[in-house]
């Protein structure tokens, strides 16, 4: 008898909403066969912080999973928000090319004033995105998202507040517990699985899976991109695979006929197109759900589903 394919759960952007995460987890437990759930591979697609009110509690929840569900495998991808949070806390690895983290400022220096980059304690050796994350943006309203900014261009104010400090305060560096710093340090930029099953119109297919927060760039060599992500190359000012938009939306052409699933969050949309899975229905908005996709079935589970008893 053929072995049953392993269940893979990919969870979209959480953005500080602990109640949504709790409800989603209960719904996943209700919707999935108990033995499949207990042995599942669970990939969190990044963006745990910012926008919502309870980043601290979200990270506490994620840290608790390996002990509560020891037979599951948990993967925590870095989103662009989590990367910037880590950059502010001084948790990013040094650039392997010998450059300094402050060298990442130059490319975007024209935006320093309007984005109000952080200039407090420790800024001199901080990655660009850490400075942007803790900065104080001049504009008060984000016209693209149709909502007010929460402190910075990243809406990081709510993350500071969840740790009991005001936005932009260097006190956050001491307020974040060591267990949270370890979690942020250990996040991966990409996760690869050689054999994941997915249901298609032609039946069940065995595929490679690549999970990365925003996606892979369409026109560039895939292996070179994966090398950069595996190595966590912090010499780059803006990492497209974590923060790009149109340029990382599609599957790279060289993967078109290679049975490779590319799964991401980030884009504020739920988009299922063949082997390209984008799971971010919530986008950090208070009134939108946090969603997950379950493989092989491609079933979508949301925190708003009335499944748990």
From Swiss-Prot:
Changing residue 51 to A: Weak activity for the pTEpY peptide HTGFLpTEpYVATR. A divalent metal cation 2 binds at residues 47, 80, 213, 266. Pfam families: Metallophos. Expressed in roots, stems, leaves, flowers and siliques (at protein level). Inhibited by the tyrosine phosphatase inhibitor orthovanadate, but resistant to the serine/threonine phosphatase inhibitors okadaic acid and microcystin. Inhibited by phosphate analogs NaF and Na(3)VO(4), and the adenylates ATP and ADP. Inactivated by zinc ions. InterPro entries: Calcineurin-like_PHP_ApaH, Metallo-depent_PP-like, RLPH. Substrate binds at residues 15, 51, 132, 238, 245. Keywords: Cytoplasm, Hydrolase, Metal-binding, Protein phosphatase. Its cofactor is a divalent metal cation. Binds 2 divalent metal cations per subunit. The active site is at 81 (proton donor). It catalyses: O-phospho-L-tyrosyl-[protein] + H2O = L-tyrosyl-[protein] + phosphate. Its EC number is 3.1.3.48. Optimum pH is 7-7.8. GO terms for cellular component: cytosol. It is found in: Cytoplasm, Cytosol. One of its GO terms (molecular function) is protein tyrosine phosphatase activity. A divalent metal cation 1 binds at residues 13, 15, 47. One of its GO terms (biological process) is peptidyl-tyrosine dephosphorylation. Its main location: cytoplasm. The keyword Cytoplasm applies. It is an enzyme of class 3 (hydrolase). Changing residue 238 to S: Slight reduction in activity for the pTEpY peptide HTGFLpTEpYVATR but strongly increased activity for the TEpY peptide HTGFLTEpYVATR. Weak activity for the pTEpY peptide HTGFLpTEpYVATR. Belongs to the PPP phosphatase family. Protein phosphatase that dephosphorylates specifically tyrosine-phosphorylated peptides; especially active on dual-phosphorylated substrates containing a phosphothreonine-X-phosphotyrosine motif. This is Tyrosine-protein phosphatase RLPH2. It comes from Arabidopsis thaliana (Mouse-ear cress).
